A protein has these predicted regions:
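Aromatic/glycine/proline-enriched transmembrane-helix motif characteristic
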Residues: 13, 17-20, 113, 122, ...
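Transmembrane helical bundles and short interhelical boundary loops of multi-pass, membrane-embedded
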Residues: 2-3, 35-41, 238-257, 292, ...
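Start-transfer (signal-anchor) and selected internal transmembrane alpha helices
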Residues: 1-35, 107, 121-122, 132-134, ...
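Perimembrane helix-loop-helix junctions
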Residues: 2-3, 8, 194-219, 230-231, ...
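Specific aromatic-rich, kink-prone transmembrane helix
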Residues: 115, 158-175, 335-336
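Loop-to-helix entry region of an early transmembrane alpha helix in multi-pass inner-membrane enzymes
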Residues: 81, 85, 95-114, 270-281
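Transmembrane signal-anchor helices characteristic of membrane glycosylation enzymes that use polyprenol
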Residues: 14-50, 59, 106-109, 141, ...
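Extracytosolic helix-loop segments that constitute the early lumenal/periplasmic catalytic or substrate-binding loops
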Residues: 47-78, 82, 92, 232-242
Length: 400
C-alpha cells in the first residue's frame, strides 16, 4: 500500500516525465564533456595552452592583452582580443588552462542548443515542443559538437552562437539587434564572415532597413575590443589579427573537403598559387547564381526560406573558398540541424554531412587517414542534394 507522500512523488514524476528525461539527458551530455577534459591535441599543446599561460603571466585582465602572445613555435597569436580577454578572465580562477579553455566553449554549447530551440519554436509553432526537444538532444550528443569544444578545445561554437542569435533577430525583424549580435560574432572570429553573403542578400531583397546598419558590425567589434585598447593595443593590432588570418595558409585546403580537393589534394603550395584567385572568383559566382535565381523567381522571404538561404550561402562560401579548415563548416552544419527539423527529407544529407565532418575531425584529432578526393566528391554530392531539395522547397508558389 502506497503512502500519500510516495503517491505524490510518483504523480509528480509521471506528470513531469518529459522535463525530467530532458534534464537527465542534458546531465549525461555534461558528463560526456567532462570525461574528455584531459584530452590534449597539437592545437592545445602548441597554441591554446601557451597563449593562456602567457596571458595569465602578463596579468590576466589587468595586462594579459598588453603585448603579443606566441605559440610554441613562436607564431604570434591569431585569435581575437575578445577571445583572449575571455581567457584572461578565466586565468584568475583556480582551474587548469586546458580545462578553462574547454569550459568556455562548453558553456556556449548549451547556450547554442537553447538558441536552436528558440529558433525552431519560432519556425514551427505547431510542433515547437517536440521539434525543439529533438534538436536540443541531437545537438547535445552530436559528436561534432562535443569533439569541437570539449575534446579539441576550439571556439567555433562561440561565434556560431552569436550568428544564430543574429539570424533569430533578423527572423523577428529586429535588424539593429541582428547586426549587433553579428558584430559580436565577428569580434570573436573572422570566420563569422561566412554569414555575410546572406546579410548582403537580405539587405538587398528585403529593403526594410538602411545600409548604415552595417556600420553596427565594426562598431560593435571595436567596443568589444575596449579592454585591449585600455591595455595599450591599437586598432592596427586588431586589424592585423584578421589580415594575418587571411594570409596565413598557403595550401588550397586545411582539412576541409572543398570543391578544389577534387583536383588537388591540398598538400602542395603549387596548387594554392594556381587556384587561389580562381577559387575566390568561383565562390563569388556561385553565390551570385543562388541570389540571382531567388531574385528572378521571386522567392518569398518567409522565415523558413530565410533559414534555407542562410544555410546555402554559408555552405557555398565555405565549400568553394580556398584554405578552409575542417572546422569552418560548423555554422552551416548547425543550421542543417534546424533545416532537418523543418524538412525531414534532408535526413540522409544531414547524416552524410555529419559523417564527413567526423572523418575530418578524426584526421585533426587522431591523425586518421582518409581519401581527400573521395571526401570532396561526397561533400559535392551533399551540396548538390541540399541545393536541389531546398530550391525545390523555396520555389513553390505557395508560402509555408
Amino acid at each position: 500500500m502506497k503512502i500519500k507522500a510516495e503517491e505524490r512523488v510518483l504523480n509528480f514524476l509521471q506528470n513531469h516525465i518529459d522535463y525530467i528525461l530532458l534534464a537527465l539527458i542534458l546531465c549525461l551530455s555534461v558528463g560526456i564533456r567532462f570525461t574528455v577534459r584531459f584530452f590534449e591535441n597539437g592545437d592545445a599543446i602548441n597554441y591554446l595552452i601557451p597563449w593562456y599561460e602567457q596571458i595569465k603571466a602578463n596579468g590576466g585582465i589587468f595586462g594579459g592583452l598588453s603585448k603579443p602572445i606566441y605559440s610554441f613555435d613562436g607564431t604570434v597569436c591569431n585569435y581575437s582580443f575578445v577571445y583572449q580577454f575571455f581567457l584572461a578572465i578565466l586565468s584568475h580562477f583556480p582551474i587548469k588552462p586546458l580545462y578553462g579553455i574547454k569550459l568556455l566553449s562548453c558553456i556556449f554549447d548549451y547556450l547554442t542548443m537553447f538558441e536552436l530551440a528558440r529558433i525552431i519554436t519560432l519556425l514551427i509553432p505547431e510542433k515547437k515542443v517536440q521539434k525543439s526537444r529533438i534538436a536540443v538532444v541531437v545537438f547535445a550528443f552530436h559528436p561534432v559538437v562535443f569533439m569541437n569544444s570539449a575534446l579539441w578545445g576550439q571556439c567555433d561554437v562561440i561565434y556560431c552562437f552569436w550568428i544564430l542569435l543574429a539570424l533569430d533577430m533578423f527572423l523577428r525583424e529586429k535588424h539593429r539587434l541582428g547586426f549587433i549580435f553579428y558584430g559580436i560574432a565577428f569580434a570573436f572570429k573572422l570566420q563569422a564572415v561566412f554569414f555575410l553573403p546572406f546579410l548582403l542578400f537580405y539587405y538587398f531583397y528585403k529593403k526594410r532597413f538602411s545600409i548604415i546598419n552595417f556600420l553596427l558590425i565594426p562598431i560593435t567589434a571595436l567596443v568589444l575590443n575596449i579592454p585591449a585598447f585600455i591595455q595599450g593595443r591599437t586598432i592596427k593590432d586588431v586589424i592585423s589579427i584578421y589580415t594575418g588570418n587571411t594570409n596565413m595558409y598557403k595550401i588550397i585546403s586545411m582539412g576541409y573537403p572543398s570543391f578544389w580537393n577534387i583536383i588537388n589534394d591540398g598538400l602542395k603550395k603549387e596548387g594554392y598559387s594556381s587556384l587561389k584567385y580562381v577559387a575566390i572568383a568561383i565562390t563569388v559566382a556561385a553565390l551570385a547564381i543562388h541570389m540571382y535565381v531567388w531574385l528572378k523567381r521571386g522567392v518569398a522571404l518567409t522565415h523558413k526560406n530565410m533559414v534555407y538561404m542562410a544555410f546555402l550561402l554559408t555552405f557555398t562560401t565555405v565549400f568553394f573558398l580556398p584554405s578552409m579548415h575542417e572546422r569552418y563548416g560548423f555554422v552551416y552544419e548547425v543550421m542543417a540541424l534546424v533545416i532537418l527539423m523543418l524538412y525531414n527529407k534532408t535526413l540522409p544529407l544531414y547524416l552524410g554531412l555529419s559523417t564527413i565532418t567526423l572523418v575530418m575531425y578524426g584526421k585533426g584529432l587522431y591523425s586518421t587517414n582518409y581519401n581527400v578526393v573521395l571526401m570532396a566528391v561526397a561533400n559535392l554530392v551533399i551540396y548538390i542534394g541540399y541545393t536541389y531539395l531546398l530550391a525545390k522547397k523555396m520555389l513553390k508558389t505557395e508560402t509555408e
